[in-house]
Amino acid sequence: MHSLPLLLRQSLRSTGALSRSAHRPIRAPPLPSHLLRLPTAHPRPFSVCLQCQFRTQSASYPPNKESDKPLDTETPSKHPDSTASFLEESLKTQAEAGTPADSTTTTTTTTTSPPPQPTPNEPKTADSSLRDTLPSYLDNRRSQFSKQFTTMMDNLQSNIFVAGQRLNDLTGYSEIEALKKEIHTQEDRLRAARLHVRNAKEAYASAINRRSASQREVNELLQRKHAWSPVDLERFTHLYRNDHTNEVAENEAQEALTAAEREAEEAAAQLSKSILSRYHEEQVWSDKIRRMSTWGTWGLMGVNVLLFLVFQIAVEPWRRKRLVKGFEEKVIEAIEKEREMNHVEILSPTAAAATAGAVAPVEAAGEDAAPAPVEEETTSDGASVVEDTTGGVVEDRADLAHESYKAQLPSLPSTLSVDSWRQYLHDLFSERSMIITQRDLSSVALQSAAAGAAVMGLVIALIRPR
């Protein structure tokens, strides 16, 4: 069987020979106006296959100018039928005219407009604004801290579950959870065993009823034995033969019922044992937790007592010594300031008297010049005597004030003596007014609450019934 291209080639050769002998050139019909405007395709090399010769070629993009298109013509895309018919007519004409197979043919080309390229200066369109609101774009703009926080919140439930599991492992509650699961399994087993017992009872009852009915019918046949017909004889033989089968079925149903009841009893006993074991383990676990809480309460109370003793034995005396030392330094500083002020007040009238004594000899210098040195010496001696007297008085006053302040300071006994503790207790319950900050008041309240809770826990632990 010859191929289609070979047959076409032979037909073209025969028609070409006939046309050459006739010497009658045949003109091709004129092309329509809408096909003349199609761009020409590049010629292809010779190919045996005619389908390859008429393959669609891609051409360059034609200028998209609407002004060049005539108004009275239509585009080729609107005349697909006319284009196909024209191609068929041209093929027939070429075949009749004897054109060689390697002649070039017109090919249809499809023109596609390239996609518009956005310019960089062009404003954002609706697509770009829509792209900015996409979840992926917003997710990429999130900070790393926000992503970590989201991941942590997503894993929070699993982390809490893992922490609870670790706590159960430490306290021993995981074994109790295993016992709970085992109890659920035993409950399912007991439920299935009871259902099996119910089915076995029904099967045993049906076997008994079937055998009883068979025996009842046999007894009826035996009562009218003298009037048996062939059908009755056959029926009696059948019933007598099935009696053994019914007996075996009844015995098997009874054994199955006994086994099902035994299994149900074992499942119930195992369930009761598991429940008792779980109750015992929960009691032990609760006792351990209560014991741990008791020891924790004792430890908290011991810490509070230790802090109280440390504050009363070490911190409180050190604070009192620091306050006393600071008070003494302030008193000494006040005494020094008072001494300096008294010294300045005493020196001011002495300087005024010396100035007045110096002015008087200057006025009398013209009258009596010889006795002037004697008077000057007398004045200087008097001033030195006054200064010595004033300095001695100031020192005596400062010493007296220092001694009086020291006498006014409270005598602090030793911190380990009985008098110090008696004085401290008396000071605790005295009516002395003092200024305290809110922080100190809050710390005292918290310490009192902790001490009260510790004492109440101790009392409850002691009077709790064993």
UniProtKB/Swiss-Prot annotation:
Segments on the Mitochondrial intermembrane side according to the record's topology features: 316-442
Positions in the Mitochondrial matrix compartment: 464-466
UniProt subcellular location: Mitochondrion inner membrane
InterPro entries documented for this protein: MDM33_fungi
Signal peptide positions on this chain: none
Lipid bilayer topology: Multi-pass membrane protein
Biased composition (Basic and acidic residues): 65-81
Residue ranges crossing the lipid bilayer per the database entry: 295-315, 443-463
Region (Disordered): 59-134, 366-388
Keyword Mitochondrion: yes
Ranges of compositional bias, category Low complexity: 99-112
Keywords for this protein: Coiled coil, Membrane, Mitochondrion, Mitochondrion inner membrane, Transit peptide, Transmembrane, Transmembrane helix
Residue ranges that the Swiss-Prot or TrEMBL entry lists as coiled coil: 173-275
Subunit field text: Homooligomer.
PANTHER family, alphabetized: SENSITIVE TO HIGH EXPRESSION PROTEIN 9, MITOCHONDRIAL (PTHR31961:SF3)
Role description: Required for the maintenance of the structure of the mitochondrial inner membrane. Involved in mitochondrial morphology. Causes growth arrest when highly overexpressed.
Protein name per Swiss-Prot or TrEMBL: Sensitive to high expression protein 9 homolog, mitochondrial
Gene designation: she9
